[in-house]
């Protein structure tokens, strides 16, 4: 039985399932992080599954073999939030050293701001809760807190190391954010 969290192996994948998991454990995993904003802040879900069960986070998922990033964003938003994404734009990259320090896999997330969508919000069974936040809750991925604060999308709670005034996060391309590209 395939791991329902990762869903990375498809029937048309060029590797066997055993080969896929052997490689998967040894290399960074590309993910997309879905950023949906509204009048009440940023939409977060609380994970009901491992890894990081019980933590607040941006909905996200592994990019599948042969999948375009925009298609991965649309798939994850549909599966985890019940939303149909019609437009999104890349905000930047999130690395997860806290995962590496815990001996977990090694994700590298590309965050996309959903700028246009349709449908009614309906979170999947992968989430035990969801909420809209202007001030980010405790119990959230620290890397995602830093990213959202640096992007100016939310206020952080309990950031251990504030960035010096004027310092940019290396994962956020402000030119792309400002130009709307």
Q: Residue ranges of each PLM-predicted region?
A:
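Acidic, metal-coordinating catalytic segment for phosphate/diphosphate chemistry
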Residues: 1-33
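Conserved hydrophobic "DFG−1" position in protein kinase catalytic cores
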Residues: 36, 44, 114-116, 132
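A short coil-to-beta-strand element that immediately follows conserved catalytic motifs
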Residues: 84-93
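Active-site-adjacent beta-strand/loop module that shapes the phosphate/pyrophosphate-binding cleft
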Residues: 94-120, 152
